[in-house]
Amino acid sequence: MMDINEIREYLPHRYPFLLVDRVTDLDFEAQSIRAYKNVSINEPFFNGHFPAHPIMPGVLIIEAMAQAAGILGFKMLDAKPADGTLYYFVGSDKLRFRQPVLPGDQLVLEAKFLSRKSMIWKFECRALVDGKPVCSAEITCAERSL
């Protein structure tokens, strides 16, 4: 549905912090998105987390979910960062980690719009590997004009 070139239009992040490789489903009626991140042993964070037992840092799993939610928010607004709007990750609730994410995994990212109050957006997010949840959270983003 969205390749990396289009994703780069909707996210201001760049290597090594762009954590969405492809969007496979964007459902405006359900206000949801499904995307993925291919986790390679070549990711820079594996050099230090942890060299003998590499696992993806939890904060980056949360960030990947927030980036997927950000794409959904931009699409719902029909806006892009180039238009002068950004989403800032400002918090999470009900955060749970269930299992580690390892090199070679495909991290599936799901986000569903929950609410918007003024410029504060809430999304219900999940990250899965092989159909099993590895992380879930309610992600809060702030919409800001540049």
UniProtKB/Swiss-Prot annotation:
Alphabetical list of Pfam families matching this protein: FabA (PF07977)
UniProt EC number: 4.2.1.59
One GO-annotated biological process of the protein: fatty acid biosynthetic process
Known role: Involved in unsaturated fatty acids biosynthesis. Catalyzes the dehydration of short chain beta-hydroxyacyl-ACPs and long chain saturated and unsaturated beta-hydroxyacyl-ACPs.
RNA-binding keyword on record: no
Active site: H49
GO molecular function term, any single one: (3R)-hydroxyacyl-[acyl-carrier-protein] dehydratase activity
Catalytic activities: a (3R)-hydroxyacyl-[ACP] = a (2E)-enoyl-[ACP] + H2O
Keyword field: Cytoplasm, Lipid A biosynthesis, Lipid biosynthesis, Lipid metabolism, Lyase
Cellular compartments annotated: Cytoplasm
Cross-referenced PANTHER family: 3-HYDROXYACYL-[ACYL-CARRIER-PROTEIN] DEHYDRATASE (PTHR30272:SF1)
Protein name per the record: 3-hydroxyacyl-[acyl-carrier-protein] dehydratase FabZ
Family that this chain belongs to: Belongs to the thioester dehydratase family. FabZ subfamily.
InterPro entries reported in the protein's UniProt record: FabA_FabZ, FabZ, HotDog_dom_sf
